[in-house]
Structure formats: structure tokens, C-alpha cells
Swiss-Prot record:
Source organism, top-level taxon: Bacteria
Known EC number: 3.2.2.-
Name of this chain's protein: Putative 3-methyladenine DNA glycosylase
Assigned keywords, A-Z: DNA damage, DNA repair, Hydrolase
Family affiliation: Belongs to the DNA glycosylase MPG family.
GO biological process: base-excision repair
Source organism (scientific name): Synechococcus sp. (strain JA-3-3Ab)
Claim: Transferase is one of the keywords in the record: no
Database matches in SUPFAM superfamilies: FMT C-terminal domain-like
GO MF annotation list: alkylbase DNA N-glycosylase activity; DNA binding
Taxonomy of the source species: Bacteria, Bacillati, Cyanobacteriota, Cyanophyceae, Synechococcales
Keyword DNA repair appears in the UniProt entry: yes
């Protein structure tokens, strides 16, 4: 299977397969922080909760592909959210990475958050803060980079046959499309978001 072939499917098919995979964030100084994905949500063009529900705009154009790129946006004017673009080019579809477990705590994580390391990236805004992902990463391709360069990519295989119990339920933190069961998380994992 080609590197991006499995990401060329609709977000509701891709989202559960990302569970257990590792998102790698490499910084220019060589530091790599790995985050095991523990919670995802799917958004597609026909979904009223999707940013591209009505039409393509400058803000959401990355959602229209190609797959394997990052769609990063700001919510509440404060926090960023990280999505992985899926499906064929021209079709708006993305998976929100809601929560992850970091393999290490970078120096910029405040002392009070270090007391509960599993909670450092337990929500989409917290995840972006922990990995220092912001709007400048919007449109980046998910691909490994050479030492001394910044990059974000995935490691591991898509979890077509999960090795841990997965819960499928409705999405949270939205007001439209709330009935769609397009949220997945690893059951009992301490890094899953609380709301």
C-alpha cells in the first residue's frame, strides 16, 4: 500500500485506524517528541459540524486535499486544533486528533502539568500546546524530514485490527451533527479527553 493510500479514504474510515499510531513532532534543534494517538474525531463535507460544510474558503481550503496534509485552525481565539486531511483531493475530509500520550515532557511543559503527564495532551488544544503546533503548520505534509529540519509525521501501521479496546461514540464540543458516532478513543486510556 502506498504511503498515503490508506489516508485517501473518508475520515470516518481513517479516524479509528489512527488510534495507537504515533505522531512525531521534530524541531529544528533535533528534538523529537512522540505522541501516541488515543482519541480521534471524523469530519466530512456533508457533515454540518465540518468547517467545509457550506463551501470552500480560504480558511478551510487545506481540508480539500490532497490527503496526508495538516489542517490546523484556531478555536475560541486561543487554542489550535490539529487535523489530518483524508479522502481524495477535492473532497473535504479530515480527522481531528483529539488526544495523545507523549513519550516525554519537553522543557516548556509547566511544572504543574508535569504532575499528571498523561493529561498534558488530553484534548485538542492541549495537544497542540504540548507539541507547539500552531497556524504556521497549516498545510504541512505529513512526512519525515532530515535532522535539523522541522517536521511532523506518523509512525506505525494503521490499526486495521486494533490491539486494544476501542470505543466509538458521538463527537463532543460541537453543536451540529452531534448525533453522528464519529468519535473513537482507546478505552480506559488516561490521556483521553474528559468532555
Amino acid at each position: 500500500m502506498a504511503a498515503w493510500e490508506w489516508l485517501s479514504k473518508p475520515a470516518p474510515l481513517v479516524a479509528p485506524t489512527l488510534l495507537g499510531m504515533v505522531l512525531v513532532r521534530q524541531f529544528a534543534d533535533g528534538l523529537q517528541v512522540r505522541a501516541q494517538i488515543v482519541e480521534t474525531e471524523a469530519y466530512t463535507a456533508g457533515d454540518p459540524a465540518c468547517h467545509a460544510y457550506r463551501r470552500k474558503t480560504r480558511r478551510n481550503q487545506v481540508m480539500f486535499g490532497p490527503p496526508g496534509h495538516l489542517y490546523v485552525y484556531r478555536i475560541y481565539g486561543l487554542y489550535h486544533c490539529l487535523n489530518i486531511v483524508t479522502e481524495a483531493e477535492g473532497i473535504a475530509s479530515a480527522v481531528l486528533i483529539r488526544a495523545a500520550q507523549l513519550d516525554c515532557l519537553p522543557e516548556w511543559i509547566p511544572a504543574n502539568k508535569r504532575l499528571k503527564p498523561a493529561r498534558v495532551a488530553a484534548g485538542p488544544g492541549l495537544l497542540c500546546q504540548a507539541l507547539r503546533i500552531d497556524g504556521s503548520h497549516n498545510g504541512w505534509r505529513l512526512e519525515p524530514v532530515a535532522a535539523g529540519q522541522e517536521g511532523i509525521w506518523l509512525e506505525g501501521s494503521p490499526a486495521w485490527e486494533a490491539q486494544f479496546p476501542i470505543v466509538q461514540t458521538t463527537r463532543i464540543g460541537i453543536t451540529r451533527g452531534v448525533e453522528l458516532p464519529w468519535r473513537w478513543y482507546i478505552k480506559g486510556h488516561p490521556a483521553v479527553s474528559h468532555y
